[in-house]
Amino acid sequence: MSAAVPYRRVVVDAPEQLRIETATLPAEVPAGHARLRPTAIGVCGSDLHVLGGHHPFVSYPVHPGHEVVGEVVAVGDGVDPSWVGRAVALEPSLACGNCRTCRRGKYHLCEDLRVMGFQAPGAMAELADAPLDRLHPLPDGMPAEHGALVEPLAVATHALRLAGDVRGADVVVLGAGTIGLTCAVVAREDGANVLVVDTDAARRQVAAERFGFQVASSVGEQAFDVALECVGNEAALRSAIAAVVKAGTVMVIGVHGHDPAIQAGWVQDRELRLQGTLMYQTEDVQRAIELLAGGRVDAGAWIDARLPLAEAQRGYDLARAGGATLKVLLVP
């Protein structure tokens, strides 16, 4: 029997309890899987919610890591050996493939969905195994660390795909964190006129100076065709609903830990479209890669810090500080 392979990974044992542990993987990669050596892992707002004890869909301990780029170092039976050495981005959703929504092609809404880094072990680690169909090759010449932005950018490409044609539309984005700004960038790429709203002055400055957006501290009196709510709290969602014109669209992108009280009367009377959006599908991931590889999205504008895996706690602290810090990468 081959010896197990030791590696280090981040574990959150309970709220506010993060540590680095040594674990092992079987020497043989499972059939249909590839073994990934992560080269960069993003610390996401959802990771902060897990550490803070505010994520509604996890049980501790949690092994985080879903914004991941890495190199394939080994493959299991049934996988072409030519995958070894490829740079890949991780699509962390694990679907059953058999439920009603999976059979309809909406695997990201699987009735038994597990997401690596939340309900399944993630890849904030020196090694990780993943099903081959969850790995997306990066084009030659694309800087490897830019692949860590594929996952958050795919959230935006999916949301804008669901929003529909926004060419020439007036779009307001509520929230200037990573997801808000990815949505703003994709909306602008799709031809929209974009206003970014955030109550935090430092984040408004980032949106204006790094990305060239018009910014505001509140929605104000202007009416918009589409509102992209990327905050995940009641006040932001109510502002989004109030901001759109009759027959306008409100995209609920932020994750709400509590059910918000909204203006249902407005939604009905004004024939508003209130659309939720969860994660992404393969076509959204592919578009995210194309935008990054083609230089349509400047990945460097998001990355503020790079830290070794051993300094994961510091990375979380930097990300939690918010303000002008958008994306912290852990580099094993």
Where are the regions a protein language model picked out?
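N-terminal glycine-rich cofactor-binding segment
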Residues: 9-28, 45-74, 89, 109-121
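Local beta-strand N-terminus motif with an aromatic residue
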Residues: 85, 223-224, 299, 312
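Glycine-rich phosphate-binding loop and adjacent beta-alpha segment
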Residues: 234-296, 331-332
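Mid-domain Rossmann-like dinucleotide-binding core that forms the NAD(H)/NADP(H) cofactor-binding site
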Residues: 142-217
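A short acidic, Gly/Pro-enriched loop at the edge of an enzyme's catalytic core
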Residues: 219-227
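Glycine-rich beta-strand-centered segment in the early N-terminal region that forms part
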Residues: 26-41, 55-100, 139-141
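C-terminal hydrophobic helical "lid"/dimerization subdomain
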Residues: 1-5, 238, 282-332
